[in-house]
From Swiss-Prot:
This is Bifunctional protein FolD. Homodimer. Pathway: One-carbon metabolism; tetrahydrofolate interconversion. It catalyses: (6R)-5,10-methylene-5,6,7,8-tetrahydrofolate + NADP(+) = (6R)-5,10-methenyltetrahydrofolate + NADPH; (6R)-5,10-methenyltetrahydrofolate + H2O = (6R)-10-formyltetrahydrofolate + H(+). Belongs to the tetrahydrofolate dehydrogenase/cyclohydrolase family. Catalyzes the oxidation of 5,10-methylenetetrahydrofolate to 5,10-methenyltetrahydrofolate and then the hydrolysis of 5,10-methenyltetrahydrofolate to 10-formyltetrahydrofolate. It comes from the Bacteria. It comes from Aliivibrio fischeri (strain ATCC 700601 / ES114). Its EC number is 1.5.1.5, 3.5.4.9. The keyword Hydrolase applies. The lineage of its organism: Bacteria, Pseudomonadati, Pseudomonadota, Gammaproteobacteria, Vibrionales.
Amino acid sequence: MTAQIIDGKLISQTVRSEVGARVKARVEAGLRAPGLAVVLVGQDPASQVYVGSKRRACEEVGFVSKSYDLPTTTSESELLNLIDELNQDPEIDGILVQLPLPAGMDSTKILEHIDPEKDVDGFHPYNVGRLSQRIPKLRSCTPKGIITLLDRYNIQVRGMHAVVVGASNIVGRPMTLELLLAGCTTTTCHRFTKDLESHIRQADLVVVAVGKPNFIPGEWIKEGAVVVDVGINRLDSGKLIGDVEYDVAKTKASYITPVPGGVGPMTVATLIENTLLACEQYHSK
């Protein structure tokens, strides 16, 4: 078996085009365009790249994009004050604070300070809680993006045994909640999991998000399983690879996401989708 490649670039562009069309229709109807505030603290090179891609996506779909590039010396109270201002700004529907924040800043405190109705990253405990209660509003971008990929490829996950490897607040935990909501029997594996291999070998759907190159050997993948690789790891050679041994896994899986070009583009597309959703649901009065 050779796996069908799940093309995240293609699907993300489709999602962005759909959002762009809805924004155009809003503006033509006399409504304002959605607004996204992107806050970057410090000079982290990877964060600058991510923020750049988010800002470009905003412009592409016709959003109002407001950028706040703050120096590393910014205090926590100054950042909280900025968030207060953005929470009150009627032209801003979404607030994104790029992680990681500089040392000394309490990221939990800062993310919780964002108005849940403008939390387009889906990190606020209110929004994660809604997902856990099966009444989601703004959903965490990477897990929601993965669900979109599975839906667009008509992969029926209800009843599948899904294994999520990684239990971070950003991907692993909300991914588990998304898969429960989708009707999967879901196992979450983490650093204390015993006999990881046995869990992977039983999985109909595997989602891996640990940030370790080739962490999951391809031979562990069950014949016909669906493999979603969230990892993005840069080797010394400069090559980007995922958390799953791709070349072997693709000979066993029915569907697989490549790295790059799989999950990554969906994160930004979902952020854009969430911002439009926040505008339509909460701020179009």
